[in-house]
Amino acid sequence: MHKIPFSPPDITEAEIQEVCEALRSGWITTGPKTKEFERQIAAYCGTDKAVCLNSATACLEMTLRILGIGPGDEVITSAYTYTASCSVICHVGATPVLIDVDEGSYHMSVANLEKAITPRTKAVIPVDIGG
């Protein structure tokens, strides 16, 4: 059996201080730290606007909705993934198409992906196992 190591989070005193500062400010979600982070991300990406959401799940669903993906559409994702990769496809009314992984990498098989693409395929949600 091939074991996949997961690394512990890299949290330094600087991150702990930032979290404490945010908590002491009384703002947890939509406060000045969030607005500043959105501004910096937008600048980094070379765009005027960015928005923070509470999870990657929310981001995936919003992306599918912005792309206009819904009933009658197919979205391909990995069969080896967290539930969010597939559940967001169902939330927008599209049909999930699950692709098996390569045995050595546990990433979506490109050969299987190519075979699964149809005229109804509107997006692919790749999965980076282990982050």
Where are these regions (language model features)?
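Short beta->alpha linker loops
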Residues: 11, 32, 36, 54-55, ...
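Structural motif corresponding to alpha-helix initiation and N-cap regions
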Residues: 13, 35, 107-110
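PLP-dependent aminotransferase-like
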Residues: 65-129
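Phosphate-binding glycine-rich loop
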Residues: 27-74, 88-92, 97-100
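N-terminal "arm"/small-domain region of PLP-dependent enzymes with the aminotransferase-like
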Residues: 1-28, 32
